[in-house]
Design a protein with these regions (language model features):
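Detector for glycine-centered tight turns/loop "hinges" at secondary-structure junctions
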Residues: 62, 85, 104, 212, ...
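Short, small/polar-rich motifs associated with maturation and membrane association
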Residues: 1-395, 399-411, 423-424, 845
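Acidic surface patches and DE-rich sequence motifs
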Residues: 59, 72, 82, 788, ...
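Conserved small/polar residues in nucleotide/adenosyl-binding loops
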Residues: 923-927
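A subset of solvent-exposed loop/turn segments in beta-rich extracellular surface proteins, enriched
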Residues: 280-281, 289-296, 452-465, 528-541
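Low-complexity intrinsically disordered tracts that form flexible linkers/tails across taxa
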Residues: 280, 427, 435-447, 840-846
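Extracellular/periplasmic, surface-exposed regions of secreted and cell-surface proteins
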Residues: 157, 205-207, 211, 413-432, ...
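Conserved small-residue
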Residues: 266-348, 596, 815-922
Length: 927
C-alpha cells in the first residue's frame, strides 16, 4: 500500500505539472473535445460524426498511469489521463489513438467506445548502447568513466560547423578553448586537466578516433556525418587503445545505411551569421587625452609625446571643440583629414583632434556563414551504404580584405554480407579546407588587433592628401593574401568473419594521408609614417622593410598505415552469467615530412612567386623528416551476473619506436567493476522514484609516449660558423655529443576513478558523479646535477618525475515530455581538477621552473592590497605627489625616472613587514 501511495503521489505531481504547462500553450483550444458545439451547422455536423471514447491506461501490473497522453492520430485532438488513468474524448469513427507516457513504449490502437490500453516499460534508456573501444556496451553495464554524447541534442539540432565547439559544456572534464576567435581555427581540446605530463607535447589532449582510426583534427570531420560520440575518460575504458590514449579518447562513429531500406536522398542547409561578442570601449578623444595628461602631470610633465602625436592642455580643449562641432558626423561625411580642422602643427609638433572609432571602421556588425549537406543512404538484404557530401563557407569579420574559410567533405560507408559468416566493409573519407586571409606583418601580441586598440581614439585612421597614415587598417588594406590548404584522405578496408555463433573476427587496414600547403605573400605597406616622432607627415614606402618583401611556401606531409586484428566472443550461461572476451593486436607506421622556403625581394608585388623573387633564400626550422612506429597486443574480459554485478579486465602490451630497443615494450593493465544496486530486491522500496542506480570504480595504467622523439639518442649539433676563418671562408663546426640517458622509457599514467550513475522518475532525471586521481609516474625530467668536471652541466632526462591530478565531475540532465507534445531538456555540468608536481629534481626550487610541490597554473608575484588613496600621499610645493612612507610601505623600487606612485596607483602588500617593497622571491625556500 505504501508503495502504491508513493507511486500515486509521484504521478499526481507529474499530472498537475503537465496540465499546467499544457494549459499555457493550448489555452481553451480544441483539446477539450467534450465542449458543446457552436450553433452553426458545421459544428453540429462534426459532433454527429464523432464517437465518445473512454480510455483506461494501465501498466503491466495493472496500475493506472496518471498523466498519459491520449491523442487522435493526425490531429491535435486529445487529452491526458486522470487520477484513475482514465481519459474521455470524442474522435472520428475508425480513428487511431496514440497512447504514450514517459518511460513507457507508445501504443497505437483503434478507437472503440470503452478501451483498456496496457503500456509496457520502455527499456530504451536501459538498453541504450554506448560505443566503447573496439565494440559497444549497454550503458547500464559500463564500469568505466564513459560519457555518451547525445548527437541529436549537441549537433543535429544546432547550426554546428565545428564538432569541438559543439562539445563545449556537454561533458564534464572536457575543456574546449580557442586562442583566437577567427574562422578556420582548430580548438584546443583537453580532458581532465591541462598538463598531464611535463614532457607531453600536447598536454592532456585526448586521442581523436573516427571509426576506430585517428584523425589529426576534429575540424576535418563533417558534423552531419556523425552517428555517435563517446568520451572515454579513465584508464580502464581508454587503455584498450594503448599508445596514445593516456589522456582519454573521443570516439566518433559515422553514419551507415540500413538493411532493406529504399534509397533516401537527404539535403539540408543552414544560413546563419556571427557577430563580435564583447568589444572594448575606447574613451573619447578629450577624455583619453585628459587622463594621459593627468598621469604625466603627476610626474612633473605638462605634455605627452608618443610616436607621431602630442597632447597638451590646448590639444585637450581643441578635441572638445572638435567633438562638439563634428562629433555627430560619420567618417564618410568628414572625408579626408584636413589640416587645421582635424590636426595641426604647433612649434614643430603635430597635434591630432579628430575622433575615430577603429573597431566600427574595421569590423562588420555581422558576417555570414552557410553550410550544405547532401547524403544518399539505403540498403538491400546484403548491402548497406551511406554516401555524403558537405560544404561549409565562413567569412571573417573584417570590412576590408577579409578572411574566408571553405571546407569540403566527402564520406562513404559501404558494408556487404558476402556469406552468412563473412562480411566486408569499406570507408572513404576526404576533407579539404582552404583559409585565405591578409598577410600579417606583425604577429603574436603585437598583431593588428593589438595595434588597433593600443592607440587613443584621436589616432588618425583617415587619409590625408590621398595617402593613409600608418595603422593596422592600412596594413590589412594593402596586404597581399596568404592561404593555407589542408587535404586529408583516409581509406579503410575491413572484413568480419563469424565462424561460429558468438565469435566475430575482425581485420581492418587504414591508409591516411594529410597534406598541408601554406603560401605567404608579403610585400610592402606605405603611407604617412605615424611612428616618425619628429614628423608624422613623412612618407615611407615600406614600413616593415625588406624582411617582409618576400614569399614563403611551406608544406607538410604525414602518411600513416594502420592495421588492426581482433576477435570477440560472447556467451551467456543459464541466462544469468554473461561473458564477453576480446583479444587483438594493432600496428601503425607514420612518416612525417615538412619543408619551408623563404625568398626575399619580389620583382612584382602582384605576382609573389619563388621564381619571381631575386633576393636571398632561406630554409627555416620547420623543415623536418621523421618516422614513427608503434604496435600492441591487447585483451579484454567483460562479465556480468544478471546485469547486477559487473566486471571488466583489460591488458595491453605496447611497443613504441620512441624508446631504446631494450625498453620499447611494457605491460599496462586495468580493471573496473560496477554494482547496480537498483536491481537488488532490498532496493524495491525506492523503485517509484529510483529508476536505476549503479556504483562503479576503476584502476588502470596506460603508457604515455607523447614525448620528444629519440630523446635517448646522443646527438651533435651542426653549426654553419665557428667564428674561425680559413682561406677566407668561415669554418663550420660540430658540437660535442649531448648527454642523455640510454634507458629512457615509458611514462606511466595511472588513474583511480570512483563514481555513480543514477536515474530518477522513469529516467527523466539523471545524475552522474566521478572522483578521480591521475598520477603520471616515471615522468621524463632532469636527473642528478652533474659536476662541472664532467664537461657538461646539462642534466640528462631520466624517468624520475611525478605529477598528480585530482578532481571531480558532476553531470545532471533532465528530459521531460508533456502531454501537449512540448519537450523540455536541460543539462548542467561541473568539473574541477588540481594538478601538482609531486616529484621533481630541482633542489633549489627556483620558482621560475618546475619543482616538487608546484601547483600547475600557479602565479608568483606581488600581492595587491588596494589603490593608493589621497590620505596615503602628500604633495610638495610644485604639486607633485609622493607616497607618505610613514603611513604605507615604500614602493620606491619601482619608481623610475619621473614616475612616482600617487593616488589611484596599485598598492602592493608588504608581506615581510620591513616597510618597503623589495624584489620577489627566487626560491620557495625563501618564503
Amino acid at each position: 500500500m505504501n508503495e502504491d501511495r508513493k507511486k500515486r503521489g509521484l504521478a499526481n505531481g507529474k499530472f498537475f505539472t503537465a496540465v499546467a504547462i499544457c494549459a499555457l500553450f493550448l489555452g481553451s483550444g480544441n483539446v477539450m473535445a467534450a465542449q458543446t458545439a457552436s450553433n452553426d451547422s458545421q459544428g453540429v455536423q462534426e459532433q454527429m460524426q464523432s464517437i465518445s471514447v473512454t480510455v483506461t491506461v494501465v501498466d503491466t501490473k495493472g496500475e493506472p498511469i496518471i498523466g498519459a497522453n491520449v491523442i487522435e492520430k493526425g490531429t491535435t485532438n486529445g487529452g491526458i489521463t486522470d487520477l484513475d488513468g482514465v481519459s474521455k474524448l470524442n474522435v472520428k469513427p475508425g480513428a487511431i489513438l496514440q497512447v504514450s507516457f514517459v518511460g513507457y513504449t507508445t501504443q497505437e490502437v483503434k478507437a472503440t467506445s470503452v478501451m483498456k490500453v496496457v503500456l509496457k516499460d520502455d527499456t530504451e534508456l536501459l538498453d541504450e548502447v554506448v560505443v566503447v573501444g573496439y565494440g559497444a556496451q549497454k550503458k547500464v553495464n559500463l564500469t568505466g568513466a564513459v560519457a555518451n554524447v547525445d548527437v541529436q541534442e549537441a549537433i543535429a539540432s544546432r547550426p554546428v560547423t565545428d564538432i569541438a565547439k559543439a562539445l563545449q559544456g556537454i561533458t564534464p572534464g572536457l575543456s574546449i578553448t580557442t586562442n583566437v576567435g577567427g574562422i578556420g581555427v582548430d580548438s584546443n581540446i583537453k580532458l581532465r586537466g591541462a598538463t598531464g605530463s611535463l614532457s607531453a607535447t600536447e598536454g592532456t589532449s585526448p586521442l581523436i578516433l573516427v571509426d576506430n582510426v585517428e584523425v589529426p583534427s576534429l575540424s576535418l570531420v563533417n558534423p552531419d556525418d556523425i552517428a555517435s560520440i563517446s568520451v572515454l575518460k579513465d584508464a580502464a575504458s581508454a587503455s584498450i587503445y594503448g599508445t596514445r590514449a593516456a589522456w582519454g579518447v573521443v570516439l566518433i562513429t559515422t553514419k551507415t545505411g540500413k538493411k532493406n531500406d529504399k534509397p533516401r536522398v537527404t539535403y539540408s542547409n543552414n544560413f546563419s551569421w556571427s557577430t563580435p561578442t564583447v568589444m572594448p570601449q575606447v574613451a573619447k578623444t578629450y577624455e583619453g587625452a585628459q587622463a594621459m595628461l593627468l598621469a604625466a602631470n603627476r610626474s612633473g610633465a605638462s605634455t605627452v609625446s608618443s610616436i607621431g602625436y602630442n597632447v597638451d592642455e590646448i590639444a585637450v580643449q581643441k578635441m572638445k571643440e572638435w567633438y562638439n562641432t563634428y562629433g555627430g558626423m560619420s567618417q564618410s561625411e568628414l572625408g579626408e583629414m584636413q589640416l587645421g580642422r582635424d590636426f595641426e602643427e604647433r612649434g614643430g609638433k603635430y597635434y591630432f583632434y579628430r575622433q575615430f572609432d577603429p573597431l566600427d571602421m574595421f569590423m562588420k556588425d555581422w558576417t555570414p556563414q552557410q553550410k550544405h549537406n547532401l547524403s544518399v543512404s539505403g540498403g538491400s538484404d546484403k548491402t548497406t551504404y551511406n554516401i555524403s557530401l558537405g560544404y561549409l563557407n565562413q567569412q571573417g569579420i573584417l570590412k576590408v580584405n577579409t578572411d574566408e574559410y571553405d571546407r569540403y567533405n566527402f564520406n562513404a560507408n559501404v558494408n556487404t554480407q558476402i556469406r552468412d559468416w563473412w562480411s566486408v566493409r569499406a570507408n572513404v573519407m576526404f576533407s579539404r579546407s582552404t583559409k585565405s586571409e591578409p598577410y600579417q606583418y606583425t604577429s603574436g601580441y603585437t598583431d593588428v588587433w593589438y595595434y588597433l586598440l593600443r592607440w587613443p581614439s584621436f589616432y588618425p585612421y583617415a587619409d590625408y592628401q590621398g595617402i593613409p597614415f600608418r595603422s593596422a587598417m592600412t596594413e590589412i588594406a594593402q596586404a597581399n593574401r596568404e592561404s593555407l590548404t589542408n587535404n586529408f584522405t583516409r581509406v579503410n578496408l575491413g572484413t568480419t568473419i563469424n565462424p561460429i555463433k558468438g565469435l566475430a573476427i575482425n581485420f581492418d587496414y587504414t591508409f591516411a594521408l594529410l597534406n598541408d600547403y601554406q603560401k605567404r605573400n608579403g610585400g610592402e605597406v606605405g603611407g604617412w609614417d605615424m611612428f616618425n616622432s619628429s614628423n608624422p607627415l613623412t612618407y615611407n614606402s615600406s614600413f616593415y622593410g625588406a624582411t617582409h618583401n618576400r614569399v614563403v611556401e611551406r608544406s607538410r606531409y604525414t602518411m600513416s598505415n594502420t592495421f588492426k586484428a581482433y576477435a570477440t566472443y560472447e556467451k551467456s550461461f543459464v541466462q544469468k552469467h554473461n561473458l564477453k572476451v576480446m583479444v587483438g593486436m594493432d600496428a601503425e607506421t607514420r612518416e612525417k615530412l615538412g619543408h619551408s622556403s623563404d625568398r626575399r625581394t619580389l620583382v612584382n608585388f602582384d605576382k609573389p612567386e619563388i621564381n619571381l623573387a631575386i633576393g636571398d633564400q632561406y630554409v627555416d626550422g620547420t623543415t623536418y623528416h621523421n618516422d614513427f612506429a608503434a604496435a600492441g597486443f591487447f585483451g579484454r574480459i567483460n562479465y556480468d551476473y544478471m546485469g547486477k554485478y559487473l566486471l571488466e579486465v583489460n591488458a595491453r602490451y605496447d611497443g613504441s619506436s620512441k624508446f631504446p630497443s631494450g625498453d620499447q615494450w611494457a605491460l599496462f593493465p586495468s580493471v573496473s567493476a560496477g554494482w547496480r544496486l537498483s536491481e537488488e530486491t532490498f532496493m524495491k522500496w525506492a523503485k517509484p522514484v529510483l529508476s536505476d542506480f549503479k556504483v562503479r570504480g576503476s584502476w588502470g595504467t596506460i603508457g604515455n609516449q607523447d614525448v620528444a622523439a629519440n630523446s635517448f639518442l646522443s646527438v651533435m649539433s651542426v653549426n654553419k660558423s665557428s667564428g674561425w676563418v680559413i682561406d677566407g671562408k668561415q669554418v663550420p663546426y660540430i658540437g660535442i655529443p649531448s648527454v642523455v640517458s640510454p634507458s629512457l622509457t615509458w611514462e606511466r599514467v595511472t588513474t583511480i576513478d570512483l563514481g555513480f550513475d543514477a536515474r530518477f522518475f522513469n529516467n527523466e532525471l539523471g545524475v552522474s558523479f566521478d572522483w578521480y586521481q591521475r598520477t603520471t609516474s616515471d615522468m621524463h625530467s632532469p636527473g642528478e646535477t652533474l659536476p662541472s668536471t664532467f664537461g657538461s652541466t646539462t642534466m640528462p632526462k631520466v624517468n624520475s618525475g611525478e605529477l598528480q591530478g585530482r578532481g571531480f565531475e558532476l553531470s545532471i540532465d533532465y528530459n521531460k515530455r508533456f502531454a501537449c507534445g512540448l519537450g523540455l531538456t536541460a543539462r548542467a555540468t561541473l568539473s574541477k581538477i588540481r594538478e601538482k608536481i609531486t616529484k621533481y629534481n630541482n633542489p633549489n626550487k627556483n620558482i621560475y621552473g618546475n619543482y616538487e610541490g608546484k601547483i600547475i597554473g600557479e602565479i608568483w608575484g606581488y600581492e595587491t592590497d588596494r589603490l593608493f588613496q589621497y590620505e596615503d600621499c602628500y604633495q610638495d610645493a610644485d604639486g607633485k605627489w609622493f607616497i607618505d612612507t610613514n603611513k604605507v610601505p615604500s614602493q620606491a623600487l619601482y619608481e623610475t625616472g619621473a614616475f612616482k606612485y600617487g593616488p589611484g596607483d596599485v598598492k602592493y602588500k608588504d608581506l615581510d613587514g620591513n616597510g618597503e617593497i623589495t624584489y620577489c622571491l627566487l626560491y620557495t625556500s625563501d618564503a
